[in-house]
């Protein structure tokens, strides 16, 4: 019903992500237990993957974007949504998912040519560790623009290597997609 009222993109931003913020708060204060939060999250995850599949956009000559979450990062809803937006705009999306070991990124960088890299930092991380990770990521993907987002990025405002760009919200990312 919500998706019928809004388009899928608007429903995600206006309804679902607001719901996740509330569910997260309820979970933190003990009003919702983890299985309830996982149930809601996985329902939405299924809808998001199905919506991405329904796009049915053939491979194009548009740039490719590699989407991944760093090791031990499991919060993939925003990453899935950004991947959906990229696909919707005709970009080739290579979605690696959660908790990708850094050494795997090194291997992928030599095997798969991409134009952009996109990752998110939601789990707690020290500012210095975040900055070190970004420097290492820049070394692995020196020619690509790297987009980063997430609560930890906003909280720490890390010093960014020259090819790294912070994405504050989905409207800003859509501007890059054209």
Region spans (language model):
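C-terminal regulatory/effector modules of DNA-binding transcriptional regulators
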Residues: 39, 45-178
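Long amphipathic alpha-helical segments
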Residues: 1-56
